[in-house]
């Protein structure tokens, strides 16, 4: 199957500039911004340097993609700034949605959406009221960000979770959320949308947590156990999950479980970690409720939920330096943060950034066919980055 070109999708963006002084076409500016950004150039100045360093390659690539040979392909940092900052970030998001909509194929047996938040610390330091906390919906199997929402502080994360569930197509998906999402209305919202849930239970639901802590020691039969062992970062970790499918008796008025919509099973995970260096062993327990009974799927889903930290948040911090981003013109920090996950647009105009040029994006985009579509290998390398944004329910169709 021929895959659509990401770069061609960007040409759907309207050029909002005045008809005068259009020396550089908008697709060229977008192409330079995209190539430079995935090579970790996050200022207008380093983008200008990137275009100068790869002038011949950019000219040839533009000709392959758009069938036009340009005389000038090295815009100044001011030109890039003025042309791209006036475009709303939602327009960029829609361009990615149009591109990825044709690529997705859901597996209804394993489909999972992890929801979690991350604070952009550089933005928060400038203003406590800035929308610095980004809540993301992430597919750990496709390794794609499905959507995101920005809120001022972590305390508002629950509102963002509700909005994400409302705009995403969660049909047949297993939604995993940490304790902040363990709310009655969240569970109901997931079920009404055609999905299922696995919610972690902590102190924000004291009655439910106490019920779980009291129930498991008294359960001597009718339960299943899933185990796993691993060695990571010098620690040996044993994970064991004890699962119980709720009987009709456990859903009567004498138990707190009856108040949770669609609840079918409860789970306790015991994690024992042995630090080889320090010679210390620690044990912790965590509790979960779910609207499905398949304990093996739940055990794997809880484990995969951590991929939003390991694959997305870690990538944003370590490789893309998200915590160093600050408030910017043309929409503020949350606007840039939302596109830190597609990492292509609205970079800072700070001169303090070192001007470094590399050829990462040139290597990726050199795999371009004459038909102006990216090769499968290049598409996979691009779509598996945390800056990709996936379609909302109105455009995301399972195939």
Predicted segments, located by residue:
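Membrane-interface transmembrane-helix boundary segments in multi-pass integral membrane proteins
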Residues: 329-340
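Short amphipathic alpha-helical "interface-anchor" segments enriched in bulky aromatics
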Residues: 292-327
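Active-site beta-loop-alpha junctions of metal-dependent nucleic acid enzymes
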Residues: 149-167
